[in-house]
A protein has these predicted regions:
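Short, polar loop motifs at secondary-structure junctions
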Residues: 41-47, 305-307, 543-545
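Substrate-recognition "cap/lid" segment bordering the active-site pocket of phosphatases
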Residues: 47-49, 245-247, 251-298
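Short glycine-rich phosphate-binding loop at a beta-alpha junction
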Residues: 15-17, 68-70, 136, 245, ...
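Hydrophobic, well-ordered beta-alpha structural blocks that scaffold small-molecule cofactor pockets
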Residues: 1-107, 492-495
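Active-site neighborhood of HAD-like aspartate-dependent phosphohydrolases
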Residues: 126-174
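Short amphipathic alpha-helix with an adjacent loop that forms part of the alpha/beta core around
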Residues: 7-8, 56-65, 120-128, 287-292, ...
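Long, low-complexity, Lys/Arg-enriched
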Residues: 92, 105-106, 297-303, 311, ...
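Short, acidic loop-to-helix structural element flanking the phosphoryl-transfer center
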Residues: 188-189, 193-246
Length: 680
């Protein structure tokens, strides 16, 4: 949008400009006299003067009669600014636009397809590249990306790491960003220069600038991943014999950028233009340097930033092609409805892991139906189940340690994966994968008519003979040919003895026990408790119908309480988690005379088991990355965010046909449900 168009929107109203960088200086030189500018706003400074205008706090804007705020920043930064001051603007009836005329108070509707996204296709990129003699690539968010929501999240993660070492720099992340922005007004700084400014403004020398810079570099380097489809394009251009240049705005040295490129196998490029080495950015004269180096050659630049990569390269006579960053795709889909739940760095890391996985490929919108999709069960585990299962595992571990339990039983088969995650925490709590099932516990726990009546109160979808066989392990052709209750109680005595043999082999200590079950009323725990002399407390993901067990004297604490079912989305989607949390062997039905588990006949195919394994590997990969990236002190539970991630399994297109053939099994009740019906 040209200024005159923006001026038509503003009219003669008083305005404030947000931003005090060099682009603001340029804007004021060209347009300052044409507009009624009251002052400048900034995220760090709220007083002083610059470019002949006062810097004022946003709280004073309404009293000064300002009706418009114009944000002068890159599109990606505009969004962050709008989030920061949007509510203030709405509450004070102040319009908020960027310098390109975009209304920053407009809310993008949530979508699960790319129909409203217009972008160049891979085919168009290849055509443009064929006509170019030199091809320049941006680096960050184009060839590589970070496993965080924004590069500034690196500062918050580093702050957590420093605090865990006893190094506290108040407002560290704010100082770090301000130093970078302030120094960049003159020319792109090196990371060491940024930290010299940080230490100066923070008023201390906890580390040297070099040490802090090295720690940030190592952290950032560990957060990077390659955008595989863009690398494929890069490699194809190298194979075509094109001259390739990497043109990047960065505070890292040329040697460090080379390390990044080497890590991900980027070879065959001819030159590397690093802004802080040349003392000029892409928004300044870096593209002039590129043009001069290849004078007379037709150059194509490929990057993600609308302003720095596309507009600025074009202003230097360079052709440009935009590659969508993961953040841009996320924004274009209205943040998929999850963005409102973000409140801390833990949430931002979760979002970052999600974006890095689902939007790694910038050409997603080229698919025929343009729906957001996932290709494999491992993605389902990682993207949709990983956040919820991670928060639950951390909650359970914290609860067990805080309450003084030093041993925990992970009941089969739900506990198969959870125990693996528990091991990754390297906790001192002794843990045992405990072979059991609702059926096995019931068979070993039958001691009275009341027990039989309790089990019979739970409806079974089958004949009386089938009920007796499936639930109690007694096989007869005619239920009337035996004394049913006596047979059940006798079976219970024998199974109790067999189970004690199994327990003795485990070598469980004499202290109180924590017991894991995933989604349950408490039946399994109730009957297992009879096999142990010590107290047992259940730690469940979700307890169903707790009022049904109120008179059973059970000690149970649940991650999700039943009373919250009306306000929580988990009750619509936990079946998906329950299906994936299984083991690679059938349900156990009882113990043999030597205390070894006996299993029912496997009903799942090898293909089904491979699907479960892939989904569980995805969850484990997510958990491992989350633990690696975020210090323990910064990990925060957020069920609402987790629920929204999980609910997305109903919104995206699942391309793994093997996953879609799975069935949700419940042998105890004689029920089988297609997974397609569960995920709607």
């Amino acid at each position: 949008m040209e200024l005159y168009e923006l001026k038509n929107i503003i009219g003669n109203n008083k305005i404030a400009l947000y931003g005090i960088g060099t682009e603001t200086e340029r804007f004021l030189k060209e347009n300052g006299k044409k507009l009624s500018i009251v002052g400048l706003l900034d995220g760090f400074k709220s007083d002083g003067e610059i470019y002949g205008y006062p810097i004022i706090p946003i709280s004073e804007i309404p009293a000064k009669g300002v009706k418009f705020i114009i944000v002068i920043a890159r599109p990606g930064s505009c969004k962050a600014i709008a989030k920061r001051i949007g509510d203030f603007c709405r509450g004070n009836d102040i319009a908020l636009f960027d310098v390109r005329g975009r209304n920053l108070l407009d809310v993008t509707a949530v979508a699960y397809d790319f129909r409203n996204i217009s972008g160049g296709s891979r085919k168009e990129l290849i055509k443009m590249a064929a006509e170019a003699e030199v091809i320049s690539f941006d680096l960050f968010d184009t060839l590589v990306m970070r496993k965080v929501m924004s590069y500034t999240d690196v500062f918050d993660i580093l702050d957590c790491q420093l605090r865990d070492k006893g190094i506290i720099i108040p407002d560290f992340a704010k100082h770090r960003l301000f130093a970078e922005k302030n120094l960049s007004k003159e020319k792109p700084p090196r990371l060491e220069q940024i930290y010299e400014a940080v230490l100066s403004s923070a008023g201390g020398a906890f580390f040297s600038a070099e040490e802090l810079a090295e720690q940030e570099w190592q952290l950032d380097f560990s957060l990077l991943s390659v955008r595989e489809s863009v690398k494929d394009v890069f490699d194809s251009f190298v194979s075509m014999g094109k001259r390739i240049v990497i043109t990047t705005d960065t505070y890292y040295s040329k040697q460090q950028i080379t390390e990044i490129l080497d890590k991900f196998g980027f070879h065959g490029y001819d030159d590397l233009l690093v802004s802080c080495e040349y003392g000029t950015a892409k928004t300044q004269e870096l593209f002039s340097i590129l043009s001069d180096k290849f004078s007379g050659k037709r150059i194509l630049h490929i990057g993600d930033d609308e302003f720095a990569d596309i507009e600025k390269s074009g202003s230097h006579g360079i052709d440009a092609f935009r590659i969508y960053s993961a953040a841009a795709l996320f924004d274009a889909l209205g943040g998929l409805g999850v963005e409102d739940e973000i409140s801390n760095i833990s949430d931002r890391v979760k979002i970052g892991l999600f974006l890095e996985r689902i939007f790694n490929d910038p050409f997603l919108f080229e698919d025929e139906d343009q729906r957001l999709s996932v290709k494999d069960a491992s993605d389902i585990g990682y993207l949709f189940c990983g956040p919820m299962i991670s928060d639950f595992t951390l909650w359970m571990n914290d609860s067990i340690e805080r309450q003084g339990y030093d041993q925990v039983l992970f009941g089969a088969r739900d506990g198969y994966l959870i125990e693996k995650l528990f091991q990754m925490l390297r906790t001192s709590t002794s843990h045992y994968y405990f072979h059991t099932s609702r059926t096995a516990a019931i068979r070993a726990g039958m001691e009275s008519q009341d027990d039989i009546d309790y089990v019979d109160s739970m409806k079974f979808f089958g004949s009386p003979e089938e009920t007796l066989k499936v639930r109690f392990g007694i096989d007869v052709n005619d239920i009337n040919s035996i004394d049913r209750n006596s047979a059940i109680l006798e079976k219970g005595k024998q199974q109790g003895k067999n189970y004690h043999k199994y327990i003795d082999k485990l070598g469980i200590g004499g202290g109180d026990l924590a017991f894991f079950d995933f989604v349950a009323k408490g039946t399994t725990q109730m009957y297992l408790q009879r096999l142990f002399s010590q107290h047992m407390k259940g730690f469940y993901f979700l307890q169903l119908e707790p009022e049904f067990m109120a008179d059973k004297d059970l000690d149970i604490e649940a991650f999700y309480a039943d009373e919250g079912k009306d306000s929580s989305a988990i009750f619509d989607n936990y079946y998906i988690l329950e299906t994936i949390l299984t083991a690679p062997y059938p349900q156990m039905e009882e113990m043999d005379d030597d205390g070894n588990p006996i299993y029912v006949k496997e009903t799942r195919s090898d293909r089904d088991l491979r699907v479960f394994d892939r989904a569980q590997c995805g969850i484990m990969e997510y958990f491992e990355e989350y633990l690696r990236i975020l210090a323990e002190s910064a990990r925060k539970e957020n069920k609402k965010l987790d629920e929204k991630f999980l609910a997305l399994v109903n919104k995206v297109k699942i391309l793994d046909e093997d996953f879609l053939t799975l069935k949700v099994e419940d042998p105890f009740f004689g029920r089988m449900t297609d997974i397609k019906d569960v995920i709607g």
